[in-house]
Curated annotation (Swiss-Prot):
This enzyme scavenges exogenous and endogenous cytidine and 2'-deoxycytidine for UMP synthesis. It catalyses: cytidine + H2O + H(+) = uridine + NH4(+); 2'-deoxycytidine + H2O + H(+) = 2'-deoxyuridine + NH4(+). One of its GO terms (biological process) is cytidine deamination. Belongs to the cytidine and deoxycytidylate deaminase family. SUPFAM superfamilies: Cytidine deaminase-like. PROSITE patterns: CYT_DCMP_DEAMINASES_1 (PS00903), CYT_DCMP_DEAMINASES_2 (PS51747). Keywords: Hydrolase, Metal-binding, Zinc. This is Cytidine deaminase. GO terms for molecular function: cytidine deaminase activity; identical protein binding; zinc ion binding.
Length: 130
């Protein structure tokens, strides 16, 4: 499957505005493609910080709720120009759970620059079910 990264970035730039970030204003949006279907998620902060939901896990929940189990592509959009943005450890483990060897992950900054990773580059020697 060929992806239109320009279109995906435009979608994520619209979706990221829905993030609920009253504490950090660090907005993140995620788009997952699984079996040619798209699933979106945004980060949702909570005053009880451990209850906060990351955009990646939000998108995974949408995908699983729709009956899908294997991620083909992950696009994570950050509202900063940090150049070193990437999923947190908890999200990396969640992404690994539903990824396969060919899963591709893109980390995109708000200037549309991006870095591409494989799941193994993102979480080397991650814990996997047998």
């Amino acid at each position: 499957m060929k992806v239109n990264l320009e279109w995906i970035i435009k979608q994520l730039q619209m979706i990221v505005k829905r993030a609920y970030t009253p504490f950090s204003n660090f907005k993140v949006a995620c788009m997952i493609i699984a079996n040619n279907q798209t699933f979106f998620g945004v980060n949702i902060e909570n005053s009880s910080f451990p209850v906060t939901l990351c955009a990646e896990r939000s998108a995974i929940a949408s995908m699983v709720t729709s009956g899908h189990r294997k991620i083909d592509y992950v696009f994570v959009y950050f509202n900063t120009k940090n150049k070193s943005n990437s999923p947190c450890g908890m999200c990396r483990q969640n992404l690994l759970e539903f990824s396969h060897q060919k899963t591709k992950l893109f980390c995109i900054d708000n200037d549309s620059s991006y870095k591409q990773f494989s799941i193994d580059e993102l979480l080397m020697n991650g814990f996997k079910k047998s």
